[in-house]
């Protein structure tokens, strides 16, 4: 215990301690050979020497640097010797402290008089030190109880300040006195200064410690200013202390800039103390976890307890609403959170056009829930409706009775560059897009003209396709091309039967795929005739993959020029003839079958995106959707892309640029259809006219629901919400029609007289009713909904 001043050997002196006797200057030497003797240095009964040094400003080399790094001009002495030899009275030489190397500021440590007050160091304040004659008189000695009471008061006053770390070199002791730190070196901030408690055996008057503000140096220079065991040098008189008014007086000596910073610091402290303790750390942790949970949750509505209670209360009040009202309420309820089915949505391949959406819905029902995490990581949770930016994201402001709380959204960067789609096109390196922007790559003038014109304008100007034939060389020229192609096909088939080598170069040239001398490509006009349509399967038998891909690119590039598109659109042909309807069925049976077969067996994801991109950029998509053929072609592309994307996600083949490219192309497609989706449903007069021609009592609109299901299947939650909002009336119209057929079925089933005609009509009604429900549920199941027992509910 001799290190702390408690000498058990009884060697304490009775007289005052002479500093010159206690200091032998060992700190000035570079190598001190006795400090490593711990038994002699820290021993209990060993004679303690005076060679224990904490630093000496006069020493050179590392010792001097260490002292300089502390920023305090401490003098070299031995605390062990000082405490061991006893406490002496004040020195009587009367020399004042004249510089930082004067040893008289250390006089009080060996004196029996009270220690001097702690004075601010020259580095920590810009105010001059007060003169000795300005010191206040000594205060009466306080008892230990008074000191502890003052300490508790000070701790309560500054309990909300962040405490500094305990200074190294100071022993741990009783509760520390806390002082507000004044701004030093232009860095305001609350801190605490804890002076070391006196040793138990030393008669030191603790009341002489200043209780006012004490300026403590902070880190304001490259070398941190720390505190050491020795007090800072300064003009301090041994028996005097700095008055409380000195700190206030030093504030007046601060520069205006420092005073402004001091006021700002005080304002910050008051603001912090005003709300201090308002929330406990547990409360803050709960709020943080709740906010983060709203970001990553898969189903925020179903996981919200308050929304579940609200939903139960609202359902309890429904007693007198009609059946349709219940259906609408159920639909609106689920459209907020279950509509998108973004965690149940799946991307399934469709090998044939008629079965592609059915397969997708089947797999969507049976698909395991493990893909929820994958789609959550893909970030398919953004909404584009009314939103407000906040710290954590965007909060939806569309609140209603079925959306009682705000939904937190994560902001996403959307490309604002109008040429962003062009950059996406450049990424399709595996597709020859050079010829897709125009009718040919050989003529730049024709390419510019092709980009400027709207291809659908020809369709609106002439419904019978005569204009397109004239722009491709005339009807006679097109018929001659068809005959030439037939001759080449016959020669190739003859060579194939004879086992000879086949060369399809002449046939390829006869198709005029790369001919740029016409506004409308002659190959497109060849498909206006039944003979040209029927020869296509035989043509594909002698083409390689690149040639087949070029033909498909040409078809999708000039899709609006196809006469079959004009004939199958209710806008250009509101009252088609029976011959025209048969031609539409022929094209669908042959050409669509060829396209589906090629895309299913020989195409990749990049090529399908290229075809869809050409369709979007060179055609009026909203006009194509009014045509049965155009709607089926778009359905084939997006369904096949959904298949490849799904298969690739399992084997991790697709890269992030490819996924982002698909999202860009889909957004472009959806933008061209937005606010026009309801136009894909033909008017009632058009359907009645077709049913009269075909002598049917039921209009099959399965291709429309297949398109809607495929569009929703590949889209995100906000896309699906827009689709539902636009086709809501058609959904309820289909439900009403099915209910009407159900009532008619009940009426016929209760008739006592049964005949063969009655049974046939009853079977037809049952089939049509089930077909309506099947088509509607085909669309609803993609989004996790189902129409059953007179209401739209969640798909189990």
Curated annotation (Swiss-Prot):
Gene Ontology molecular function terms on file: chromatin binding; mRNA binding; RNA binding
UniProt xrefs under InterPro entries: Pat1-like, PAT1_dom
Biased composition (Polar residues): 377-402
UniProt modified residues of type N-acetylserine: 2
GO biological process, any: mRNA processing
Disruption phenotype: Increases the level of stress-responsive gene mRNA during osmotic stress.
Keywords: Acetylation, Cell cycle, Cell division, Centromere, Chromosome, Cytoplasm, Kinetochore, mRNA processing, Nucleus, Phosphoprotein, Repressor, RNA-binding, Translation regulation
Biased amino acid composition, Low complexity: 165-192, 406-415, 434-450
Annotated positions of the Phosphoserine modification: 456-457
Region Disordered: start-end pairs: 1-21, 164-200, 365-465
Compartments (UniProt record): Cytoplasm; Nucleus; Cytoplasm, P-body; Chromosome, Centromere, Kinetochore
Entry's family note: Belongs to the PAT1 family.
Cross-referenced PANTHER family: PROTEIN ASSOCIATED WITH TOPO II RELATED-1, ISOFORM A, TOPOISOMERASE II-ASSOCIATED PROTEIN PAT1
Quaternary data: Associates with the 40S ribosomal subunit. Associates with the heptameric LSM1-LSM7 complex. Interacts directly with LSM2 and LSM3 within the LSM1-LSM7 complex. Interacts with DHH1, LSM1, LSM5, RPB4, RPB7 and with topoisomerase TOP2. Interacts with CDC33, PAB1, TIF4631 and TIF4632 in an RNA-dependent manner. Binds mRNAs.
Protein name as catalogued: Deadenylation-dependent mRNA-decapping factor PAT1
Origin species: Saccharomyces cerevisiae (strain ATCC 204508 / S288c)
